[in-house]
């Protein structure tokens, strides 16, 4: 890639009304791909996540991860002049993304029907827990609410215990990625038709889309089959799950055509003749017995890596179950910039995830930056609305423009780690 090559979405402008994770993930991806993302922050505290993660000198690691590659516009929308400024920007905006509860953005005066009259080419994406329509749409919700409504939470955990909650924002991040994909498709459609459109993304829909197997099975066999939690084993494939080894755990999967390789690695090829293990269906029914056999073999190795080496020699699909810090230090992850090192003037050097897809024309950016609240007010308003220095000064004096705020360090001591439940 040469320095002169334009970034993929260069020239597209995004107005970002998002907060927490799902919405910011969508707009952050657009920003990474070159769009000019203008994040609207409506108070000196800004996005709630500015107070989460490690906070130092007005910057939060949580905020940085989900909001780099954006410019911050601090504006008080309770003041009529603040709303007027943003409405005046709409003709020059390509994409608007928001993740308020359904109806809130319209109540603020920025609903799609109103904005499309100002700019028919506008692509607008709303992200919520359960969508903009339907009986559940007005319920408040976060990531885990979408998972529960989609029938996903019930499938997680041990069969004789309560369902579990993953300690990561799977639904938020996945919905943000899906929304960014949809925005890209809508922009492509606009290039062909000249018209924008409205996109309705939800955590519930994204979670439901993740069901691998059981949706058509349940609909074809109503009342005859009920998926059950299966703990660390896959409910419909065997062997497929987490197995205990000396000094750790191994994720191991062997489909029918791979079973001979697994049994060769184990030195027990005759097990294929055992009726309990001859087919996938029989192995699923006898999962506990097969697990005992596999873990008994794994116990003969001095450590996990030795067992994996034996499996690798037969090309049996397997992997060590790595702790997060082990994954972050893995040379493969570093080499692909799946883990990438960035720098902030307050936080110093630290790691964030890379892009989920690698592009041949230009690599993941590492010179990314996150803005303080209102840091880019003057530049944004001069570029888009040609606001004069005199008028900018008046807007600050009237409290319409907000600048200099950050996560409240009186509430969050510098360097502390503060975590809240994942919120869409």
Where are these regions (language model features)?
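N-terminal helix-loop segment corresponding to the beta1-alpha1 unit
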Residues: 1-192, 219, 225-226, 372, ...
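Glycine-rich beta-alpha junction loops
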Residues: 44, 129-131, 203-208, 247-249, ...
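A short glycine-threonine-serine/GTX helix/turn-capping micro-motif
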Residues: 163-174, 196-198, 229-240, 249-251, ...
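Substrate-binding/catalytic subdomain of NAD(P)-dependent oxidoreductase enzymes
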Residues: 187-230
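Beta-strand segments within the central parallel beta-sheet cores of soluble alpha/beta enzyme folds
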Residues: 196-204, 310, 392-396
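Aromatic-enriched alpha-helical interface/lid elements that frame and gate functional surfaces
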Residues: 225, 233, 239-314, 318
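A glycine-rich dinucleotide-binding beta-alpha-beta segment and adjacent secondary-structure elements
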Residues: 313-366
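C-terminal active-site "lid" helix and adjoining low-complexity regulatory extension at the edge
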Residues: 350-389
